[in-house]
From Swiss-Prot:
It comes from the Bacteria. The gene is rplB. Signal peptide: none annotated. The keyword Nucleotide-binding does not apply. This is Large ribosomal subunit protein uL2. It comes from Leptospira biflexa serovar Patoc (strain Patoc 1 / ATCC 23582 / Paris).
């Protein structure tokens, strides 16, 4: 997958870049596996803004993705590699030997005609899904379950993967994309390989309107608002806000730890590293 830069025929296209989509083999989705989604643009049931910076966007169909990969022992053939507007990674339409079609997350390198399989007896091969205790240490995996049978929840975005670092009793240690090391039950399923569309983060949006197509509205700083709208607002002329940075609801931000403890924290072996460049 490569990135194509547009010629600067207009000011808005000067830094504009798009994916070339050479891996995509089908444009129209498989209709039985699509659904209509009700987009609320960040509004609640009374029409009030519940999530800021969300607005109208292009229409899209929801693709029903199989995150569980629970058809054990039945081989499937990859029919198409498709674009999904609801996620950054590409998806693949697979047809099982019993005739059932399903969408799965497409790993990088998966091609039309490839055979994939799920289950403890599956081969260690790109696109196959196995329990973590059946996968060798050092293997790149994605779409990893946190709870047995719930479906993949970890490493589902474009180009992401986790690495199996160690096995200890009933648990397997995973190094996650955030550099966090976490223990997961050995019965949880994971898919071999890293996800497709790894150049997704290199795309330059290029113009404001393109973000509006995605449903993203502008982000306004608190110090330029009125006092009624934000704790940092108001003042005569340009001000610093007059206090430590806070959210619109008065909660400290920029360095203040807001992460709550939860029972699953005991499975974290090593916390994620801080991003010094942020």
């Amino acid at each position: 997958m490569g990135i194509r830069k547009l010629k600067p025929t207009t000011q808005s296209s000067r830094y504009y870049s798009v994916l070339d989509f050479k891996e995509i083999t089908e444009v129209v989705p498989y209709k039985p596996l699509t659904a209509n989604i009700s987009y609320k643009a960040g509004r609640d049931n009374k029409g009030r803004i519940a999530v800021r910076r969300k607005g109208g966007r292009n229409k899209r169909k929801f693709r029903i993705i199989d995150f569980k990969r629970n058809k054990f022992g039945i081989p499937a053939t990859v029919k198409t590699i498709e674009y999904d507007p609801n996620r950054s990674a590409f998806i693949a339409l697979v047809c099982y030997a019993d005739g059932e079609y399903r969408y799965i997350l497409a790993p990088n390198g998966l091609k039309v005609g490839d055979k994939i399989e799920s289950g403890p007896a599956a081969e260690i091969k790109l696109g196959n899904t196995l329990p973590l205790d059946k996968i060798p240490a050092g293997t790149n995996v994605h779409n990893i379950e946190l709870h047995i049978g719930k479906g993949g929840q970890i490493a589902r975005t474009a180009g992401s993967f986790a690495v199996i670092s160690a096995k200890d009793g009933d648990y397997v240690s995973l190094k996650l994309p955030s550099s966090e090391i976490r223990k997961v039950r050995k019965e949880c399923l994971a898919t071999i390989g890293e996800l497709s569309n790894k150049d997704h983060n290199l795309v330059i949006i290029g113009k404001a309107g393109r973000n509006r197509w995605l449903g993203k509205r502008p982000k306004v700083r608190g110090v330029v608002m009125n006092p009624v709208d934000h704790p940092l607002g108001g003042g005569e002329g340009r001000t610093s806000g007059g206090r430590h940075p806070v959210t619109p609801w008065g909660k400290p931000t920029k360095g203040f730890k807001t992460r709550k403890t939860r029972p699953s924290d005991r499975f974290i072996v090593q916390r994620r590293k801080k991003n010094r460049n942020r």
